[in-house]
Structure formats: structure tokens, C-alpha cells
Swiss-Prot record:
This is Chaperone protein DnaJ 2. Pfam families: DnaJ, DnaJ_C, DnaJ_CXXCXGXG. A zinc finger (CR-type) spans 143-219. CDD domains: DnaJ (cd06257), DnaJ_C (cd10747). The lineage of its organism: Bacteria, Pseudomonadati, Aquificota, Aquificia, Aquificales. Zn(2+) 1 binds at C156, C159, C207, C210. It is found in: Cytoplasm.
């Protein structure tokens, strides 16, 4: 779905934009009870709940919520990342109960039988990791590789991320492997999903290594390539380097938010660079040539034409930043500033203040009068 047609996440959950995390969780719990497919059997409930779950996954995560508040749905689409940050997999109702109420629906079975129950869970995509990275303008010009240290969840090596031990399974004693129970008599019968195995027909024991979580935590250094021409605020993605998916689901992605430090000489606007140079008043009148630096290390000579005005821009083609999308480079603009000396400085240099003042008055008489008010 295009970002222009997607509903506002706050509107989906029915909360204001300044809602607290507790208000967001409360709204989500209310919608779970109304629309979760395990509760609501209407065909439209599944798509509705996917929308609700996606909104909650973003607004309940402070980093993702910050990006969403700044850029809207575009924060997780298009430039840089090229991936959508969303969770359309529907977590089982017991997983939600565990998250909000610290309640395991299987605990009743465990207390009654004295052994852990571990049904097959529905796979869920792993959470994304968002990391800010600061680089210099020179690094943005040339491109660079930066090491990113992250602590991420990885699939359990013992169970492969499923959370259960397939070698230790048995037919459900309640339903006999059918996945449903039948109550009533020959005249009237009610069929319902087996409460012991959740409709699977088989009971699996939790993995001993991860105790059913399906993942473990590891610290990892990931080298991320920053392309030449990257802009401040650009989003880059390393696919599959987020947190592990739940119960065999695909992993999330690692998102890099690039911050380019301000430069002491150059100002950047898009793919163009701006540099300020000072010239004297006679140079402005007569014209001159100045040498200016560039980010590729060379210096270029720029001609200042006679009659140059304060703040005038002189374009040096092809000496700006590399274009991130496309070939070539932007332009370098030299912004001219005229250093007008005070009369006291001229008097010291020439040794006669009155003579300097007379010369300036004579010059003022012959020069054309400028328009005082500048029209934009």
C-alpha cells in the first residue's frame, strides 16, 4: 500500500499524537479484544488487525515513533532503506496475553500435568534495529565504511528459532490428535478448538536451550558501507541484520540514520557546496583571481569579474558533492564578501587622514548613485 493511501497510525489506534506509551498500550489491548482473529471470526477482522498491529509496532517503539512523527509513512519506505518497517504477521493471542499480563495460557496445563507445554507458535517477523551514525562531510564526499556495534537477538542454535524441541512431541491426550474437541450428545454436538494443543493435535516441549523463547542475545560488529554523496538524514538498510524472527519468522533489518557533521569551510545545499571568500574593495572594482579549496583536495582558481557586488555568487561547475542517485557531481558556489576598510585604517596606511577623506569624497561625486531600496 502506498504511503499516500495508508491511514495515520494514531488514527488507527484511536489515540492523540501526544499519547503516552501507557495510553498506546491501553488502546492496543482494547483493539486486540475486539479484532484479533482468534476472537473475532469475521473475515474482515484479520486485515483490520494486521493494520492495528503494524501501527502498534511503530508507535510502541520510541525510535520508530520518532521517525514516524518526523517523516510519516515515508520514514519506512523509499530512499535509502527501500524497505517497509511493518509487522503484518499476527501474533497468537496467548503471546499478547503474555506480553501485557505476564500470563501464560499454557500454565494451567503445566500445573495439571507437571510438564511444560509448547505448542507450535505462529512465526512473526523480527524487530528492526535503528542506529544513528555521524560522519564528516569529507566521508560523505568520498564514501566510507563504518563499524556498527549492535546487540541483536539471533535464532537459538538448538531449535533453529522455533522455540520447541521436535524430538520431544506426543499426540495431544485431550483431542487424540484431531485438534478439536466435541461436547454434547448424539442429538446436539459442539465442536471447538482443543484448549490443550490449540488445534495442532500435537504437544511439543519447549527447547531446553532457550526455554521456548526461540532466540538468544549476541553482540556483533557489522561493517556498513556509506556511499559517496550520502545526505544528512539518509536512511540505509542492511537486510536481515535486525532481531531474529519469532518461532521461525524472518529477521528484521538494521537501519542506519546518517548524520553529517557541519563543515568549517563548506556549506552544503543538496548536491551543491558553498564557500565564502573575502576580497578587498579595489579587487571588487578592478576584478581579481582567488584560489579556493575543494573537497577532492585540489585548489581551483576562480576569476572575480570587475564590479563584483557583496554576496555575489560565482559558479564553479562540477565541483560539488557526488550525486547519490545518478552520475556526476553538483556545483561549487563561491560567495564573495567585500572587505571595506575603516577610514582610520586608511589614514594609518597613507599617513594623511584629511587627504584620504577628500579623495573618498571626490570618488563619491563621480560614482553613479545606487538605488537605496533593493527590490526582490
Amino acid at each position: 500500500m502506498a504511503s499516500s493511501t495508508k491511514k495515520d497510525y494514531y488514527e488507527i489506534l484511536g489515540v492523540p499524537r501526544n499519547a503516552s506509551q501507557e495510553e498506546i498500550k491501553k488502546a492496543y489491548r482494547r483493539l486486540v479484544r475486539k479484532y484479533h482473529p482468534d476472537i473475532c471470526k469475521k473475515p474482515e477482522c484479520e486485515e483490520k488487525f494486521k493494520e492495528i498491529n503494524e501501527a502498534y509496532q511503530v508507535l510502541s517503539d520510541p525510535e520508530k515513533r520518532k521517525l514516524y512523527d518526523m517523516y510519516g509513512h515515508a520514514a519506512f519506505e523509499g530512499a535509502g532503506a527501500q524497505q517497509r518497517v511493518e509487522t503484518t504477521e499476527i501474533p497468537p493471542i496467548e503471546e499478547i496475553l503474555r506480553e501485557f499480563f505476564d500470563f501464560d495460557i499454557g500454565s494451567i496445563f503445566e500445573r495439571a500435568t507437571g510438564r511444560r507445554r509448547a505448542r507450535r507458535r505462529r512465526s512473526v517477523k523480527g524487530e528492526d534495529i535503528v542506529v544513528p551514525v555521524e560522519i564528516t562531510l569529507e566521508e560523505a564526499f568520498k564514501g566510507t565504511t563504518v563499524p556498527i556495534e549492535v546487540e541483536r537477538e539471533v535464532p537459538c542454535s538448538a531449535c533453529g528459532g522455533t522455540g520447541y524441541d521436535e524430538s520431544k512431541s506426543r499426540t495431544c491426550p485431550t483431542c487424540g490428535g484431531r485438534g478439536e474437541t466435541v461436547q454434547g450428545n448424539w442429538f446436539f454436538q459442539v465442536r471447538q478448538t482443543c484448549p490443550t494443543c490449540g488445534g495442532e493435535g500435537v504437544i511439543y516441549e519447549n527447547c531446553h536451550a532457550c526455554t521456548g523463547r526461540g532466540y538468544g542475545l549476541v553482540k556483533e560488529t557489522i561493517k556498513v558501507k556509506i556511499p559517496p554523496g550520502v545526505r544528512d538524514g539518509s536512511k540505509l538498510v542492511v537486510e536481515g541484520k535486525g532481531h531474529a524472527g519469532r518461532y521461525g519468522g524472518p529477521p528484521g533489518d538494521l537501519y542506519i540514520i546518517v548524520k553529517v557533521k557541519p563543515h568549517k569551510i563548506f556549506e552544503r545545499k543538496g548536491d551543491d557546496l558553498y564557500v565564502d571568500v573575502n576580497i578587498t574593495y579595489p579587487e571588487a572594482v578592478l576584478g581579481t583571481e582567488v584560489e579556493v579549496p575543494t573537497l577532492d583536495g585540489e585548489k581551483v582558481k576562480v576569476k572575480i569579474p570587475p564590479g563584483t557586488k557583496e554576496g555575489e555568487l560565482i559558479k564553479v561547475p562540477g565541483k560539488g558533492m557526488p550525486r547519490l542517485k545518478g552520475s556526476g557531481r553538483g556545483d561549487l558556489y563561491v560567495r564573495v564578501h567585500i572587505d571595506v576598510p575603516k577610514i582610520g585604517v586608511l589614514s594609518k596606511l597613507l599617513g594623511d587622514g584629511k587627504k584620504v577623506e577628500e579623495l573618498l569624497k571626490q570618488l563619491q561625486e563621480v560614482l553613479p548613485k545606487p538605488e537605496r531600496i533593493v527590490e526582490r
